[in-house]
């Protein structure tokens, strides 16, 4: 089986989150996104990111409110603007032609990954899709990948994982 990350691996979407960071922080009169902040987010779940953001910037806000705001900004981008990485669709077609089971393991919420994959006509190509929200752990931990393997009906040892973040590779 093959398990794919979405942001930065199948989807050319990393700019979406940096754009959201800039706009979100600008609304709070924080005019520069610190590099250390951006780097710390790489393998966190969506909720962990909201909690980290509150702590990092000492915001008097609730994680659910922040996640809702981010979701509204991101739904627009993922539904209409995010493109597949070059040759991603062809590679997935090739794997499907070899009867290789396909899975997704992503930090994206269902509200974002469904429209992104549907927009490119590949949502139904995946035999299993797991979000870090399903296990409440980021991708630096093995649990998201283990659940993806279970849902694919294969042992983790029989999976190849495609990731772009070193911490996530460690988790896999």
What are these model-predicted stretches?
Residues 8, 171-172:
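Residue preferences within the helical output face of two-component receiver
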Residues 35-36, 64, 105, 127, ...:
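Residue-level detector of family-conserved "landmark" positions at structurally sensitive sites
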Residues 4, 162-163:
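Active-site flanking residues adjacent to catalytic metal/cofactor-binding acidic residues
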Residues 10, 84, 102-105, 137, ...:
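Conserved SAM-binding loop
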Residues 96-103, 145:
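Short, conserved structural micro-motifs that define repeat-unit consensus positions
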Residues 1-98, 111:
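N-terminal helical cap/lid subdomain that shapes the substrate entry/recognition surface
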Residues 81, 109-160, 166-170:
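Substrate-recognition "cap/lid" segment bordering the active-site pocket of phosphatases
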């Amino acid at each position: 089986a093959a398990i794919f990350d979405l942001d930065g691996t199948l989807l050319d979407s990393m700019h979406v989150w940096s754009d959201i960071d800039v706009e979100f922080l600008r609304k709070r009169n924080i005019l520069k996104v610190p590099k250390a902040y951006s780097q710390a987010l790489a393998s966190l779940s969506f909720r962990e990111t909201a909690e980290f953001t509150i702590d990092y910037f000492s915001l008097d806000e609730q994680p659910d409110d922040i996640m809702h705001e981010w979701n509204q900004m991101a739904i627009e981008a993922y539904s209409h603007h995010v493109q597949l990485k070059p040759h991603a669709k062809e590679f997935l077609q090739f794997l499907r032609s070899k009867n290789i089971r396909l899975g997704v393991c992503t930090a994206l919420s269902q509200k974002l990954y469904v429209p992104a994959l549907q927009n490119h006509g590949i949502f139904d190509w995946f035999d299993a899709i797991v979000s870090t929200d399903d296990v409440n752990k980021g991708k630096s931990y093995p649990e998201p990948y283990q659940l993806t393997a279970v849902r694919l009906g294969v042992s983790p040892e029989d999976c190849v994982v495609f990731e772009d973040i070193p911490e996530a590779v460690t988790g896999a």
